[in-house]
Each structure stands twice: as C-alpha cells, then as structure tokens.
A protein has these predicted regions:
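Short alpha-helical transmembrane segments in multi-pass integral membrane proteins
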Residues: 1-18, 75-143, 186-214
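Hydrophobic faces of transmembrane alpha-helices in multi-pass small-molecule transporters and flippases
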Residues: 3-34, 59, 63, 67, ...
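Transmembrane helix-bundle signature of multi-pass membrane transporters/permeases
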Residues: 18, 50-58, 95, 137, ...
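Transmembrane alpha-helix boundary and packing residues in multipass membrane permease domains
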Residues: 21, 25, 33, 37, ...
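Hydrophobic alpha-helical transmembrane segments in multi-pass membrane proteins
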Residues: 21-29, 33, 65, 97-106, ...
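Helix-terminus/linker motif at the lipid-water interface of multi-pass membrane proteins
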Residues: 26-53, 59, 77, 115-125, ...
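Small-residue-rich hydrophobic transmembrane alpha-helices
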Residues: 50-113, 147-166
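Short runs within selected transmembrane alpha-helices of multi-pass transporters and secretion channels
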Residues: 68, 140-159, 165-174, 181, ...
C-alpha cells in the first residue's frame, strides 16, 4: 500500500475513455427495458413470440458480438503499438467474417424458421404465437447483417478509444430512432405488434447510414 500512487493523468484518461462506454451500456439496457414495457401492452402470445424470436436470432448475433469484443482488444493493442495498418486489416477481416456469418446464417434460418419456432412453440396449441414468431423472425433476419456490422464498428470505436462514438451510435439507434418509432407506430398509426419490428428495421438502417457518414 505504501508504494500505491494515484496518477491523476491516467485516472482522467480512464474516465474519459471508460465513462462513455459505461453510459452506452446503461442506456442500451434501459432502452430495451422500455421497449419491453411497451411490448407488455400487447397480448401474451406477442410477448412469447418476440422472446422466442430473439433467442433464435441470438444464435447468429452472439457470434458477431463476440467478434466485435475481440476486435476491440486487437485494435487497442495495435494502435498502442503504432501498427495502424494492422489494426485496419483486423477491422476489415472482422467485418468480412461477420457479414459472412450473418448473411449465410440468415439465409439458412429464413428457410428453417418454422421448424426452429416449433421447438419452442406448438403450432397446434398456440397458432397465434407461432405465426407471429415466424413473421417476427423474418424481419429480425432481414436486418441481422446490419446488426452484425453495428457490433463490429462499436468494437472498433471502443478499441480505438473513441467511446463517445459508441455512445452516440447506441443513443441514435435506440433512443432517437427505435423507441420513438415504436411509440409512434403503436399510438398514432396504431398497427399493433408489427410496430416493434418495423421500428427495428428503421433504426438499424438509420444506424447503418450514420455509420457510413462517420466512416466517410
């Protein structure tokens, strides 16, 4: 303990880099909590369908998230070693892997939606939930590559120490686009449960456009 010293310079840097990432995670968790509260307004079969759809989608989304997490460490190490070209190569290689996983996986799962959903929901006993989940999965898988790309760019920005961009992207995608659109489609347009997946598609395309502008 006697040799323990606090270096305000490093502590300040840790806060500058770490706080936006922490706030981003907190905002994301809170945002999905609010989405769940909005979904609770629908019938039980809708909640069941969305839950099952998210579990099936996670089969492909979690690997993409893992690649993004590893990429953050790899980019941070290479930028620290002044190996910028290597960091760029790791970004595009990770992007390629993620796009391949999500596109090929989404195409396969699109054809296997009904058998996969039948593992969790009995079509005979609960046809409404079954058909709703199959319909919901179509939209989830449609934007899955965009979700994967979003995870890669988030890992890239965090690894490069630009965590403020991660916070901006998470805020834009969830709080500026998805939540307002869900509320608007539910309460103004009144289209019911599809409000959730239409808003999801809009928010992911909006995030993709924002990412392309930042990259340019």
């Amino acid at each position: 303990w006697k040799d323990l010293q606090f270096h305000l310079k490093y502590i300040k840097t840790l806060f500058i880099v770490g706080m936006p990432a922490a706030i981003s995670q907190a905002f994301t968790s809170l945002g999905f909590l609010l989405i769940n509260s909005l979904v609770m307004a629908f019938d039980g079969y809708v909640i069941n369908a969305i839950g099952v759809g998210n579990r099936i989608n996670s089969l492909l989304l979690f690997p993409a998230m893992s690649v993004g997490t590893v990429l953050a460490t790899f980019i941070g190490q290479n930028i620290g070693a002044n190996q910028i070209s290597r960091a760029k190569k790791s970004l595009w290689f990770s992007m390629l892997i993620t796009i391949m996983i999500t596109v090929i996986g989404a195409c396969i799962l699109l054809f296997l939606r009904r058998p996969l959903v039948s593992i969790f929901i009995n079509e005979v006993d609960n046809p409404q939930a079954f058909n709703m989940c199959v319909y919901y999965l179509y939209f989830l898988l449609l934007v899955l590559p965009l979700m994967g790309i979003f995870q890669i760019w988030t890992g890239c920005f965090q690894g490069a120490g630009r965590t403020g961009l991660s916070l901006l992207l998470a805020t834009m995608r969830l709080w500026v686009l998805r939540l307002p659109f869900i509320w608007f489609l539910m309460n103004i347009i009144k289209i019911g449960p599809p409000s959730v997946w239409y808003a999801m598609v809009i928010s992911n395309f909006g995030a993709a456009i924002l990412l392309s502008l930042i990259h340019i």
